[in-house]
Amino acid sequence: MPPITLDKRIHEPVRLAIMVQLVAEGPQLRFTYLRDTLALTQGNLASHLRMLEAAGFILLEKRAAFADAATYVRITESGHAAFAAYLEALNEALLPLSH
């Protein structure tokens, strides 16, 4: 059996959870929604988002409306493609276990 190759930029549990949320509920979510839903600190979430942004999987957008400012996280086309490839690789890795 060939070695399993999963994208480490996505495979880390917090980043995987972020990507799952964006695919399932996105394509765009508020930073605070992700923070609260995933029970993360602001700094921890920001650190993982920077890694996903550097990979081109997400975009961060700051918006100000009246006195309220918010950061939105949007999955990119590249992020969708990388997530689909990740799921395909994971399915291939698990396929031998289904027999």
Where are the language model's segments positioned?
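Amphipathic alpha-helical dimerization/coiled-coil segments
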Residues: 1-3, 81-99
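N-terminal helix-turn-helix DNA-binding core of bacterial DNA-binding proteins
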Residues: 5-44, 65-66, 70-74
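Short, hydrophobic-biased segments on the C-terminal half of alpha helices
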Residues: 49-50
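Glycine-centered, phosphate/nucleic-acid-interacting loop/turn motifs that mediate DNA/RNA or nucleotide
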Residues: 56
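Short beta-strand "wing" residues that participate in macromolecule-binding interfaces
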Residues: 60
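Basic, amphipathic "hinge/linker" alpha-helix immediately C-terminal to the N-terminal HTH DNA-binding motif
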Residues: 65-86, 90
